Amino acid sequence: MMKKWLLAAASLLMVVTLAGCGSNTIATLKGGKVTQDEFYKEIKETSAGKQQVQQMILQKALQEQYGSKSLTKKIDKTYNTYKKQYGSSFTSVLAQSGLTTSSFKNQITTQMLANAALKANKKVTNADLKKQWKTYEPKVEVQHILVEKKDTAETVISELKKDNSTKNFTALAKKYSTDTGTKKDGGKLPVFDSTDTSLDPTFKTAAFKLKTNEYTTTPVKTSYGYHVIRMIKNPGKGKMADHKKTLTDQVYAKWANDQTVMAKVYTKVLKKADVTIKDKDLSDILSSYGVNAKKSSAKSSSK
């Protein structure tokens, strides 16, 4: 879908560019020519073309209402972080996703503007925080040993009963673990919390039950095999009041990925933008947001 949008955007940009050059002809051939009007008519009648026009209107409305110098600095900082992370392979990595440096930056801009609109139009209530708190777990650090067979995991657990030190667990990970990505580092995983989606839910549930220095006394079965998990650091859940900012951020992150929530936010943004549609063939372009844009007296340009 993203590629279709980009294609439509490139096509519309071509129309604008040619119009700026004062030429109505895109191409000539024996017996005829292709004009801007013909090209525009074809593009606007496609679902991708209509979707792109819709996105362009929304983008401009978001920029007008929520754009700022401070936001621009955040956008640049985020973009440069990714650029530094991927180094010389940055452009090639983007190309694999059908993106250019320019379209990627536009993507970051759209995301940050959308987040700003979300926070301005929907506030997190105490009820929202309490709901989030029910499943909240703080960031923890664990190390694990992954094996194929249950009896191997039980052997590891027997060894840990004799010595549950970090040193011994690390040695056991190097000896038994089939997780080649972590065994050299003693099975250590990046820190994670309850919002993490990269780990198996069963693994997370077992891990969150452990206090610092504790380990799972029975093998934890997932689709990858059998795990033995040791908690390196678990700060404990504590009180909700101590995690209000984190909980608020988590609620907003959840809403940002909820199409129903964001559609309502965009509806407010577009209504405030007071949009007028000049092309009658696109008069219902914002109907999916429940917005009836003003219609200009101008005729359709699809002739």
From Swiss-Prot:
Keywords: Cell membrane, Isomerase, Lipoprotein, Membrane, Palmitate, Rotamase, Signal. Plays a major role in protein secretion by helping the post-translocational extracellular folding of several secreted proteins. Its EC number is 5.2.1.8. One of its GO terms (cellular component) is plasma membrane. A lipid is attached at residue 21 (S-diacylglycerol cysteine). The keyword Membrane applies. Pfam families: Rotamase_3. Belongs to the PrsA family. It catalyses: [protein]-peptidylproline (omega=180) = [protein]-peptidylproline (omega=0). GO terms for biological process: protein folding. It is a lipid-anchor. Residues 1-20 form the signal peptide. A lipid is attached at residue 21 (N-palmitoyl cysteine). This is Foldase protein PrsA. The keyword Lipid biosynthesis does not apply.
